[in-house]
């Protein structure tokens, strides 16, 4: 592959690129570049490590006519990224030379159902099509998982996979208001399956009554575009983080304690959950069956997890990755703190 930043369409072999990024500002194009992830130019410039795992990542950047992609590719090259290329002439020239593009479109029913979010510039037809093509695995169908599942189903996430081995107990209902009293005693997965079918029968739902652990996490999460950690056990959170890091899948993780909640995204290039919490906290100390929890706080964090998952899939806005959001309902305050990879982390920086 040429070392120059710019590549002509006839010089591009898509199979040779680790990452392809589309920095076009519009989300309403009827076609997409093959294998490309849509990102905003501003987000790519400010957070390149979110999209390029290393300085050696072989990357192609595309836009409409090659100007925006050329500017950002040159800037990334100046910053030390050694194999970043821009498509000369952009997608317009790619199309003019008869190169393949991926058709994007919505059916009349889809356009009507998702009209209000498609109208958002950050979503558009392309973002909605990405949602419809996505596979999201939600681990946990309780107080955090239910609002995630509800909003992703309503938004049109094409394939929802939900993992939870538990049954519904009466004490669950104060933080799981979508479930009727009649569902007490039913499996959470079965109850959620009924709910999703009633809300959006057009998406695919896969429910597994299985407990995720370090031994099965990779096989259960493989194939996901996004994983949502909605569990209430630290052992499961570490297993989700470790497996997703190995698979290269981003994780939206949230947790609640009494009146407080927290939220972040664990990107494949770190920091991971072990960077945030190197020593596993006590399961008993943070068990809501012992400490208690207020229902709306759980719903708030779960809803925010759904928002971040949608942003990841559509490429909208700025990611919360690298920041830990802390919410305190009693004081009605929220703050965010910067988090980074730990040099001693065995997952992000394994010994050589």
Question: What positions do the PLM features span?
Answer:
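Non-catalytic regulatory/accessory regions that flank a structured catalytic core
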Residues: 86-90
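Acidic, glycine/polar-enriched metal-coordinating patches/loops
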Residues: 82
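A short acidic-Thr-Gly-centered motif at the start of a beta-strand
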Residues: 9-17
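Adenine nucleotide-associated cytosolic modules
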Residues: 1-4, 19, 23-37, 41-58, ...
């Amino acid at each position: 592959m040429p070392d120059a930043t710019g590549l002509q369409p006839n010089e591009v072999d898509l199979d040779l690129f680790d990452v392809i990024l589309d920095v076009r500002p519009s989300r309403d194009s009827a076609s997409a570049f093959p294998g490309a992830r849509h990102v905003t130019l501003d987000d790519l410039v400010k957070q390149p490590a979110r999209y390029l795992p290393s300085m050696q990542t072989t990357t192609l950047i595309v836009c409409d006519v090659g100007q925006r992609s050329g500017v950002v590719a040159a800037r990334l090259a100046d910053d030390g990224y050694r194999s970043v290329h821009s498509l000369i002439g952009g997608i317009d020239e790619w199309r003019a030379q008869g190169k393949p593009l991926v058709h994007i479109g919505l059916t009349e029913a889809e356009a009507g159902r998702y009209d209000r979010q498609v109208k958002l510039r950050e979503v558009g037809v392309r973002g909605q099509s990405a949602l419809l093509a996505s596979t999201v695995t939600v681990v946990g169908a309780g107080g955090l998982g239910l609002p995630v599942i509800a909003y992703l189903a309503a938004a049109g996430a094409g394939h929802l996979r939900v993992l939870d081995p538990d049954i519904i107990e009466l004490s669950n209902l104060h933080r799981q208001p979508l479930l009727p009293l009649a569902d007490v005693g039913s499996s959470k997965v079965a109850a959620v399956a009924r709910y999703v079918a009633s809300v959006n029968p057009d998406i695919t739902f896969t429910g597994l009554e299985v407990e995720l652990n370090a031994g099965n996490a990779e096989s259960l999460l493989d194939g996901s575009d996004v994983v949502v950690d909605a569990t209430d056990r630290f052992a499961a959170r570490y297993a989700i983080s470790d497996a997703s890091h190995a698979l290269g899948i981003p994780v939206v993780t949230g947790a609640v304690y009494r009146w407080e909640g927290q939220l972040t995204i664990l990107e494949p290039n770190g920091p991971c959950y072990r960077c945030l919490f190197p020593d596993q906290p006590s399961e008993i100390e943070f068990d809501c069956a012992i400490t208690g929890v207020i229902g709306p706080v759980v719903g708030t964090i779960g809803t925010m997890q759904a928002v971040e998952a949608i942003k990841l899939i559509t490429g909208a806005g700025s990611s919360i990755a690298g920041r830990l959001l802390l919410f305190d309902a009693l004081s009605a305050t929220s703050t965010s703190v910067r988090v980074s990879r730990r040099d001693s982390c065995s997952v992000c920086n394994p010994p050589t």
